[in-house]
Amino acid sequence: MLNSFKLSLQYILPKLWLTRLAGWGASKRAGWLTKLVIDLFVKYYKVDMTEAQKPDTASYRTFNDFFVRPLRDDVRPLNTDPNILVMPADGVISQLGRIEEEKILQAKGHNYSLEALLAGNYLMADKFRNGTFVTTYLSPRDYHRVHMPCNGILREMIYVPGDLFSVNHLTAQNVPNLFARNERVICLFDTEFGPMAQILVGATIVGSIETVWAGTITPPREGIIKRWTWPEGEHEGSVALLKGQEMGRFKLGSTVINLFAPGKVNLIASLASLSVTKIGQPLATSTETFVAPEVEPAPLPTEEIKAEHDASPLVDNKKDDT
């Protein structure tokens, strides 16, 4: 009965307005009130502040500053084996496994379409049919920056407007096509392991989704798909990120979905649904043995991310011809 009521609220509540309100409140500097809210949040969700670079909650000017707090360098050691891909986020694995032609497992008995997840981009979907996927859920207590599983060069980014359903076990079991319906940012990379998509999925009260190369992607929420492309290879203006390097962040919420091409990686055998993830720990191994080439990293922000690209509502914002 309680679960039915919670699900009904997902369809009844004004999720967009709640999200805007949460984003507005989380960005405000309110002195002692901000500290009080942070302290209550830390206590309720049992947040481990000893891992943060700034463990004192009084050092955060806004709730957003606290929520995207950077961790100490020593708390997430990076597996440097070039044949191993690492976990992109702290959280829990919701589902993982093989993409069955174009079906991705959402929850037991529930699948959704690869092409729908990729906003109907069948050319991108073709890269991942019969490939491998991992869905990682970030709870409120988790570190909310997202990192690279391996070295990668950005080729394409797509912002897809959508619903803002909460993302949790209950909604995954009961809201059809949840991840293909919610707002999301799709990032396609060329890697030593073939093409890789890293998808940042929004949810209720996820105030914003940001990337290190373009700053805030959403808001604004204008209801249109936006697309940016970059040419192949390394060149002036390309975005090359190293394994373990930050690529984006959530200001509240949510979920990261990784897609890998068929025959390129094998997931670590011990991983399963509900496995706890920590950035830098092994996620998958290459099906080939090689020594990874070095790539120059993009500069990383520490606090605020400055936008480098126009976020005007264009369907196709190309950096260069492809």
From Swiss-Prot:
Lipid bilayer topology: Peripheral membrane protein
Reactions catalysed according to its record: a 1,2-diacyl-sn-glycero-3-phospho-L-serine + H(+) = a 1,2-diacyl-sn-glycero-3-phosphoethanolamine + CO2
- rRNA processing as UniProt keyword: no
Q: Where in the cell is it found?
A: Cell membrane
* Ranges for region Disordered: 295-322
> What's the Enzyme Commission number for this chain?
4.1.1.65
Q: Which residues does this entry mark as bearing Pyruvic acid (Ser)?
A: 254
Q: Which InterPro entries match?
A: PS_Dcarbxylase, PSD-B, PSD_type1_pro
Q: How is it modified after translation?
A: Is synthesized initially as an inactive proenzyme. Formation of the active enzyme involves a self-maturation process in which the active site pyruvoyl group is generated from an internal serine residue via an autocatalytic post-translational modification. Two non-identical subunits are generated from the proenzyme in this reaction, and the pyruvate is formed at the N-terminus of the alpha chain, which is derived from the carboxyl end of the proenzyme.
Question: What pathway annotation does it carry?
Answer: Phospholipid metabolism; phosphatidylethanolamine biosynthesis; phosphatidylethanolamine from CDP-diacylglycerol: step 2/2
Q: What is its main location?
A: membrane
Enzyme kind, highest EC tier = lyase
Catalytic residues per the record?
90, 147, 254
What's a GO cellular component annotated to this UniProt protein? plasma membrane
Q: How is the cofactor bound?
A: Binds 1 pyruvoyl group covalently per subunit.
Q: Kindly state a single biological-process term from the GO annotations of this entry.
A: phosphatidylethanolamine biosynthetic process
Q: Where are the residues marked Cleavage (non-hydrolytic) as a site?
A: 253-254
Cofactor(s) in the UniProt record: pyruvate
Could you tell me the keywords of this UniProt record? Cell membrane, Decarboxylase, Lipid biosynthesis, Lipid metabolism, Lyase, Membrane, Phospholipid biosynthesis, Phospholipid metabolism, Pyruvate, Zymogen
Q: Which PANTHER family match?
A: PHOSPHATIDYLSERINE DECARBOXYLASE (PTHR10067), PHOSPHATIDYLSERINE DECARBOXYLASE PROENZYME, MITOCHONDRIAL (PTHR10067:SF6)
NCBIfam families xref list? PS_decarb (TIGR00163)
**Primary role:** Catalyzes the formation of phosphatidylethanolamine (PtdEtn) from phosphatidylserine (PtdSer).
Could you say which protein family the record assigns here? Belongs to the phosphatidylserine decarboxylase family. PSD-B subfamily. Prokaryotic type I sub-subfamily.
Quaternary structure, per UniProt, is: Heterodimer of a large membrane-associated beta subunit and a small pyruvoyl-containing alpha subunit.
The identity of this protein, by name, is Phosphatidylserine decarboxylase proenzyme
Origin organism is Salmonella agona (strain SL483)
- The gene it comes from is psd
